[in-house]
């Protein structure tokens, strides 16, 4: 398929975004960095709307989400091995819900509810039932993370196997994603 000419900023971004698609058989991932990084759950779910529907490539949303991401999330929640790196990071499932919210803006709430409603509910129950190994829901309704021995956020640089910036507690961006996920879940359950 021809990429097109680099006439304007959008076309340049579209061409660049498509370089991050990585196909493996019937699976498709977004690379976290080209060409040196592999597919990483956090970066994939953060970039997913922009690198698919945002550039007019909804077929890649289908390939990445329906053929790969849903299976990876289910495997993680069932304690099975995952190919996607970082599925256990505290904010990953919340970033996936945020990506679905962006997809709802592109399609409709009804479409997202039909396709992914049960998965969203399962993710929220997984977190609320304290099944996530690195997220802890406290009585105040906030999520708490322990980043002393293993990075808990996007600030994930390590030295000698220890986080350079250990972030422990009620991390603001994780709780912002949590609040958003709760509101979105309430919307799809109406």
Question: What do these predicted ranges mean?
Answer:
Residues 1-190:
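Acidic, mature catalytic/reactive cores of soluble proteins
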């Amino acid at each position: 398929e021809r990429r097109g000419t680099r006439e304007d900023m959008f076309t340049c971004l579209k061409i660049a975004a498509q370089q991050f698609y990585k196909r493996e058989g019937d699976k498709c991932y977004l690379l976290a960095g080209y060409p040196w990084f592999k597919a990483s759950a956090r970066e994939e779910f953060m970039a997913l709307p922009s690198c698919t529907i945002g550039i007019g490539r909804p077929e890649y949303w289908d390939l990445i989400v329906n053929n790969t991401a849903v299976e990876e999330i289910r495997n993680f929640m069932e304690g099975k091995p995952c190919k996607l790196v970082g599925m256990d990071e505290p904010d990953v499932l919340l970033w996936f819900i945020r990506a679905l919210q962006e997809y709802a803006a592109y399609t409709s709430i009804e479409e997202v509810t039909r396709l992914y409603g049960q998965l969203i509910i399962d993710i929220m129950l997984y977190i609320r039932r304290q099944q996530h190994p690195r997220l802890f829901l406290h009585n105040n309704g906030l999520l708490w993370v322990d980043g002393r021995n293993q990075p808990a956020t996007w600030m994930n640089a390590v030295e000698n196997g220890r986080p350079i910036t250990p972030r422990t507690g009620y991390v603001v961006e994780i709780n912002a994603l949590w609040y958003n996920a709760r509101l979105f879940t309430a919307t799809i359950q109406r």
